[in-house]
Amino acid sequence: MKLRTLFFLLQLFMPMLALAQYKPVEQASTLTFNIKNLGFNVAGSFKGFDGTINFDDQNLAASNFNVTVDAATVNTDNNLRDGHLRDEFFEVKSYPRIRLASTKLGGKNGKYVFTGMLTMKSTTKPISFPFTADLVNDAYVFKGEFKIKRKDFGVGGTSTVSDELEVNLNVTAKKL
């Protein structure tokens, strides 16, 4: 009976074991954002990518993303503003990472839909957005964009900064 149970468990988990695992490449990946402040566009970025991506375009049901960025790396090319964002908006000493984790992936032929959870500070919210995945040599290049409302995540209070911002992801992940 134990052998039958073991065989069943192996069959159940074998697709997950066969998935190719990828890790974000810091130097080739970007997370950028655009937001309005006093009516002017402000562009910024984050670095410090970490996490794992298990991806097989033929087995999306078993594929998943669990990626973080370092909140303290926020950069808008203005040191004074960046310090304010780290301390007052992102509270990086208490909340050092921003996490994006999938719960479901859909699509085909290089065009997909990410459904999952975005965590900033102590708030986790559902998120869904289209993305592309292109295999280049032994690495995938994942690109997607979405809009969020910063106040939904408790980021910053009332200020002259717009609530809505656009986020662009361009993540290169190498096969482990």
Which sequence ranges carry the predicted segments?
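Positively charged n-region of N-terminal signal peptides that target proteins for export
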Residues: 1-5
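Bacterial N-terminal signal peptides
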Residues: 7-16
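Low-complexity, acidic/polar, glycine-enriched regions of mature
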Residues: 20-176
